[in-house]
Swiss-Prot record:
Keyword Kinase: no
Subcellular location: Cytoplasm
Cofactor: Zn(2+)
Misc remark: Candida albicans is resistant to cycloheximide (CHX), which binds to the ribosomal E-tRNA binding site (E-site). This resistance is caused by a natural substitution P56Q in ribosomal protein RPL42, which decreases the volume of the binding pocket and prevents the binding of inhibitors such as CHX.
Protein name in the entry: Large ribosomal subunit protein eL42
Subunit structure: Component of the large ribosomal subunit. Mature ribosomes consist of a small (40S) and a large (60S) subunit. The 40S subunit contains about 32 different proteins and 1 molecule of RNA (18S). The 60S subunit contains 45 different proteins and 3 molecules of RNA (25S, 5.8S and 5S).
Molecular function GO terms recorded: structural constituent of ribosome
Function: Component of the ribosome, a large ribonucleoprotein complex responsible for the synthesis of proteins in the cell. The small ribosomal subunit (SSU) binds messenger RNAs (mRNAs) and translates the encoded message by selecting cognate aminoacyl-transfer RNA (tRNA) molecules. The large subunit (LSU) contains the ribosomal catalytic site termed the peptidyl transferase center (PTC), which catalyzes the formation of peptide bonds, thereby polymerizing the amino acids delivered by tRNAs into a polypeptide chain.
């Protein structure tokens, strides 16, 4: 279980800052895939008409987790940076801090 606070003081690469400032932390999420990307246009053109599936669909998935990517936004200049963490099964943003002798809860 990885628990990350919602704010973090870290170095900002922005042109105005270039020093340690407070950052707002969020979890990165991939955007919606565009219908007009060249690969998608080519794939749709190939798929249309008769002939079934034209490209193989990947089935041999090996990984059970994804790497968590943090999106850090500077509260001063609004510059955004991304910070990848290690793989983990349970990720929590701004959860309660651990107490001594307490059982883990998911």
């Amino acid at each position: 279980m990885v628990n990350v606070p919602k704010t973090r003081k870290t170095y900002c690469k922005g042109k105005e800052c270039r020093k340690h400032t407070q950052h707002k932390v969020t979890q990165y999420k991939a955007g919606k895939a565009s219908l007009f990307a060249q690969g998608k246009r080519r794939y749709d053109r190939k798929q249309s008409g008769y002939g079934g599936q034209t490209k193989q669909i990947f089935h041999k998935k090996a990984k059970t987790t994804k790497k968590v990517v943090l999106r850090l936004e500077c509260v001063v200049c609004k510059t955004k940076a991304q910070l990848p963490l290690k793989r983990c099964k349970h990720f929590e943003l701004g959860g309660d801090k651990k107490q001594k002798g307490q059982a883990l809860q998911f």
